[in-house]
Structures are given as structure tokens and as C-alpha cells.
Amino acid sequence: MSEAAKSTIDQSEVDRFSAMAAEWWSPTGKFKPLHKFNPVRLAYIRDHACENFGRDPKSARPLEGLRVLDIGCGGGLLSEPVARMGASVVGADPSEKNIGIASTHAKASGAPVDYRAVTAEQLAEAGETFDIVLNMEVVEHVADVEFFLTTCAKMVRPGGLMYVATINRTMKAAALAIFAAENVLRWLPRGTHQYEKLVRPEEIEKPLAADGLDIIARTGVFYSPLQDRWNLSKDMDVNYMLLAKRAG
């Protein structure tokens, strides 16, 4: 298949999230786990971006002047707080319903996010480039992981960063992130994740390296029931985040 004919879109996944679009901003709804996950991933994004671009993480707008793409932004749970850090944010999602919810919420909250119902390949074909590409909890929902990652990588400017967060394809992840989270604890609707679509770290690192991005940080993330919060961890067997950089 020619690259022009390839698509990153898995329509069944788009339809699944479109059907839940109205619940994006409910902290007790179907996206409750992402609301809980937001503080740790936002801190990770801010701290590494500030280290890379020479910013003060304690400033009110540490990402001022940086252009950021939140690919697969959903309802904008990540786009809005990143925009409040001063970044110029493009929130992209193939679901018109998700973008509608995100745009309405941003207008009400005053968050300056440029939301677009587009795919990664459409942005890349248009020549869009960014200082930071946020690829968070998306790769396990696309049709072609390698093509999706290389497409996103092409939009990272020299000296820029790409963050990737997802779930590892391990039996431990199958037990905790799928069986327990979806069937026992009911944190997520059944069918949110399929084991065969989970992605191992090396399956992310290889296509990024092929497009000139170097992995500069890796971390696991785990949920502590006692603290009722997510924390960084050395254990990458379930949830994990990778940070890649293009040489400047």
C-alpha cells in the first residue's frame, strides 16, 4: 500500500469514543481515569519541556511561545491545561463529536486552543510542525502504529520533543489495565482496550528512531489506591511514558 493511501484511523475506535463524547469533562464519568491521570502527565510534560527548552517550571506560563500538537485530543482534557501553561496548542482528533465537545468547553473556560477535526496524516501533509507533539493514550487505538508514529515524528521540529503514553503489551497489563480496570473495578467501559492492540516500548522506539528521534527518557506510571493518585515508577510493565527528541 502506498503511503498516500495509508490511514492511521481505526473507525471502530473513532466511533467508540464519539459515542462517549458527552462525558469527556465529567470527573466521575467514563473518562474518570484520565482526569485522575492528568496531574502526573502534566507535571511530566512541563518538567521535561522546561528542561529541554530552558524554561522555569515554577513560572505561571512555562511553555510560553512553544507550539504544541495534542494528537488524538479527545475532549481536550490535556489540551486546555497545556494551553494555560502558555503554549500555542493545536488539538487534533478525527472525531467531529469530540472536537465539538472540546471546542464548546474551551470557549466556556476561555482556554485558547485551536481544535481541528483532522488526522495526523492530514496535518503532516499540510506541512504543520511543532515544538512538542503530545501522543498520549492514542497509539493503542490507531490502525497502523508504525505509520502513525512516523507521521507524528515528521511534525517534530529540530530540537523538539514527542511524548508518548500508552499501555504495555504484557500479561500484567492484560490483568490490571484490561481485566481489572474494565471488568472488575469498572473504571473504563468494557472494550476500551484490546490486548492485541497494546504496544511495547520497543515498538514505539524503533519507528521514532528511524525518523531521527532519540529516546531521552522512559518512565512507568502506576495508580496508588491508598493515595488515590497516579505516580511515576520504574515499572513499565503496565502504563508507561516515553520522551523522544529530534536533534537541533
Curated annotation (Swiss-Prot):
Belongs to the methyltransferase superfamily. UbiG/COQ3 family. Its EC number is 2.1.1.222, 2.1.1.64. S-adenosyl-L-methionine binds at residues 41, 72, 93, 136. Gene3D superfamilies: Vaccinia Virus protein VP39. This is Ubiquinone biosynthesis O-methyltransferase. It catalyses: a 3-demethylubiquinol + S-adenosyl-L-methionine = a ubiquinol + S-adenosyl-L-homocysteine + H(+); a 3-(all-trans-polyprenyl)benzene-1,2-diol + S-adenosyl-L-methionine = a 2-methoxy-6-(all-trans-polyprenyl)phenol + S-adenosyl-L-homocysteine + H(+). Pathway: Cofactor biosynthesis; ubiquinone biosynthesis. Keywords: Methyltransferase, S-adenosyl-L-methionine, Transferase, Ubiquinone biosynthesis. O-methyltransferase that catalyzes the 2 O-methylation steps in the ubiquinone biosynthetic pathway. It comes from Rhizobium rhizogenes (strain K84 / ATCC BAA-868). Coiled coil: none annotated. The gene is ubiG. One of its GO terms (biological process) is methylation. GO terms for molecular function: 2-polyprenyl-6-hydroxyphenol methylase activity; 3-demethylubiquinol 3-O-methyltransferase activity; polyprenyldihydroxybenzoate methyltransferase activity.
